[in-house]
Regions:
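Structured loops at beta-to-helix junctions and adjacent beta-edge loops in soluble globular domains
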Residues: 31, 77, 144-146, 174, ...
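Signature of the catalytic double-stranded beta-helix
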Residues: 76-142
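Short, solvent-exposed loop/turn segments at secondary-structure junctions
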Residues: 33-34, 148, 214
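Catalytic core of non-heme Fe(II) oxygenases with the double-stranded beta-helix
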Residues: 133-202
Length: 251
C-alpha cells in the first residue's frame, strides 16, 4: 500500500512576507523560488550535481552512516553576498542537545558552486526575506548541503529531534528525494501545541521558518528500493554575528 503524502500549504510569492510574519513559516514552490531569486529553474537544477560529492558526516553521535554534508559561511550586506573565511560549525547544547557544544569542522562547499551567479542570487534573496522580518542589516549566513540516505536502513534528517537553530531565519530547500518513504516535515508553534505536517517533494521548493517562533523536525526516511536518499540545502541567517562558542555567556 502506498501512503498518501500530505502536500505543503504553498504561499504565493506576493504573499510570502505577510504569511511568514503571520504564522512563523511559509512554503513556496520552485517557480516562486525562481521568480523571487531571479534565477531560472534550469540554473537552480544545475546546482543539484554538487550533492553527489558530499563527504560523510563524522560527528554523528548515534553511530549512523546516513548523513553526508558540507558547510560554508557568508555575509549578506545590502544585497551583496561575500564568502566568509572557513570556520567550524558550532551550536550550544540548548539548541542541539545531541551535537551541540562541540566545534564541528566540515569540508567547505565546492567553489564551483559558490562562484555561480545562481548561488549568490539565492543567498541574496534569503537576505531580503530576513530583512523583511527583522529590518535591513548585515546577515551572517551558514549554508549546509545535506544528503540523508538509507545506508543504515533508516536515515534521520533531524537526529536531534524537534528543535530551533538559534538564528533569525531558517531556509530549507528540498533538492530532491529518490526511492524513499517518510521525510515528513513538522512545524510547531514554539508557545502552543499548534502545528502542521507536510512532505516536501518538489525539487527546489522551499520552507522558510522564523526561528524565534517555531520549532521544526523531519521524520526518518526508509528505503523503497535498494538505496534511497533525500537531498536538502539548509541555510540559516542570523543578525549580530555567527553562533560562536566564544560569544556564549559563562554560567
Amino acid at each position: 500500500m502506498t501512503s498518501t503524502l500530505l502536500a505543503p500549504p504553498l504561499t504565493a510569492p506576493s504573499d510570502l512576507q505577510a504569511v511568514l510574519k503571520k504564522q512563523g513559516f511559509a512554503v513556496v514552490g520552485s517557480d516562486a523560488v525562481s521568480a523571487l531569486s531571479s534565477v531560472s529553474h534550469a540554473d537552480l537544477v544545475r546546482l543539484n550535481s554538487f550533492w553527489n560529492n558530499l563527504p560523510p558526516d563524522q560527528y554523528l553521535k548515534d553511530g549512523g552512516r546516513y548523513r553526508r554534508r558540507r558547510h560554508a559561511s557568508f555575509l549578506v550586506q545590502g544585497g551583496v553576498v561575500s564568502q566568509y573565511a572557513h570556520r567550524a560549525h558550532w551550536q550550544p547544547l540548548s539548541y542541539n542537545a545531541l551535537h551541540g557544544g562541540m566545534r564541528r569542522w566540515f569540508e567547505p562547499l565546492d567553489s564551483a558552486m559558490t562562484s555561480t551567479v545562481a548561488w549568490s542570487a539565492v543567498i541574496s534573496f534569503l537576505g531580503r526575506v530576513a530583512s523583511g522580518l527583522r529590518g535591513e542589516q548585515t546577515w551572517f549566513v551558514e549554508a549546509h548541503p545535506f544528503r540523508i540516505d538509507t545506508t543504515d536502513g533508516i536515515g534521520r534528517p533531524t537526529p536531534e529531534g524537534a528543535h530551533r537553530d538559534g538564528v533569525d531565519l531558517v531556509a530549507v530547500f528540498l533538492i530532491g528525494r529518490q526511492g524513499i518513504k517518510g521525510g515528513e516535515t513538522r512545524v510547531f508553534d514554539v508557545s502552543s501545541p499548534l502545528g502542521q505536517r507536510f512532505t516536501l517533494t518538489e525539487p527546489w521548493s522551499l520552507l522558510l521558518l522564523d526561528d524565534a517562533r517555531v520549532i521544526h523536525e523531519t521524520t526518518p526516511i526508509q528505503p523503497q528500493s535498494e538505496l534511497g536518499w533525500r537531498d536538502t540545502l539548509v541555510v540559516t541567517l542570523r543578525a549580530s554575528g555567527f553562533l560562536d562558542e566564544a560569544a556564549q555567556p559563562v554560567a
